[in-house]
Regions:
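Catalytic phosphate/metal-binding cores of nucleic-acid and nucleotide-processing enzymes, i.e., regions
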Residues: 1-125
Length: 125
């Protein structure tokens, strides 16, 4: 089975994200990342995960990719199955799917408690 890479939508693909506002997708899209995802999809399963409705992301990215000649296909994942394995199709969900790698603008790489405590002592200051 091919490993899965999970990309967050807001702050990663949807750049310039500055809060929910009215719920629309108002920022710029990282077109270079979408093109790179096309390349990655040859070796990995690709998933986009977000708090947004998956339907909104699929409709937006389908239109964006058609307009910009980006060869990606998107499909809403079945929320009863958190594993994605459709070759060449990007799964989209508002759940946290199984993945080998998570790409997120707000993540922390946890290695051990000592380093996490040190990070937390400076967090939010």
């Amino acid at each position: 089975m091919r490993p899965t890479i999970v990309f967050d939508f807001d702050g990663v693909i949807h750049k310039g994200y500055d809060g929910w506002r009215d719920g629309s997708i108002y920022g710029e899209i990282d077109e270079g990342l979408l093109n790179y995802m096309t390349y990655l999809s040859q070796m990995y399963n690709i998933v986009i995960s977000s708090c947004r409705p998956a339907t909104q992301i699929v409709m937006f990215l389908d239109a964006y990719c058609r307009k910009n000649d980006i060869d990606l296909e998107f499909e809403i994942m079945d929320d009863r199955n958190m594993f994605w394995s459709k070759y060449g199709v990007v799964g989209v969900t508002n759940m946290k799917p199984a993945g080998a790698l998570y790409v997120d603008d707000r993540g922390f790489r946890y290695d051990n408690l000592k380093d996490f405590i040190k990070f937390m002592e400076g967090f939010g200051r």
